[in-house]
Amino acid sequence: MAQKQTPSGPTQRQQRVAELIRHALAEVLQRGDIQDPVLGSHVVTVPEVRMSPDLKLATAYVMPLGGQDEAPVIAALERHKKILRQEVARRVNLKFAPDLRFRRDETFDEAARIDQLLRSEKVQRDLESAPREDDEGEPASSSRD
């Protein structure tokens, strides 16, 4: 029986397989199994992998440590996609080895942007002028100990 994709996100199986593939990719990249000057000169992190519902496509979000030279690193990973797929298949027991797709991880940029917004003067003013509430939803007393 086919498993339905819920609109709320990936299934538990997709998440479990994605995590196994993330660990396998990270291990291959950390050990230096791929002989490439670009990959050899960068430490590449794999913070997230997302699986398609049929588990035949894995999208790996990658970022070189320090955030520099993402384009050459992703190009090198794409060049060695076949070898990486074989290594992942060897480490993860699946019926089919998923095709790998590499994308730039933008979560660090997004986190920095949100941090910058939270530190802006306008937000600081709004936070200072907003009435505080205690756990019960009642305005907190203004006395401080």
Curated annotation (Swiss-Prot):
Keywords: Cytoplasm, Ribosome biogenesis. GO terms for cellular component: cytosol. Residues 122-132 have a biased composition (Basic and acidic residues). It is found in: Cytoplasm. Residues 122-145 are annotated as: Disordered. One of its GO terms (biological process) is maturation of SSU-rRNA. InterPro entries: KH_dom-like_a/b, RbfA, RbfA_dom_sf, Ribosome-bd_factorA_CS. Monomer. Binds 30S ribosomal subunits, but not 50S ribosomal subunits or 70S ribosomes. Belongs to the RbfA family. One of several proteins that assist in the late maturation steps of the functional core of the 30S ribosomal subunit. Associates with free 30S ribosomal subunits (but not with 30S subunits that are part of 70S ribosomes or polysomes). Required for efficient processing of 16S rRNA. May interact with the 5'-terminal helix region of 16S rRNA. This is Ribosome-binding factor A. It comes from Methylorubrum extorquens (strain CM4 / NCIMB 13688).
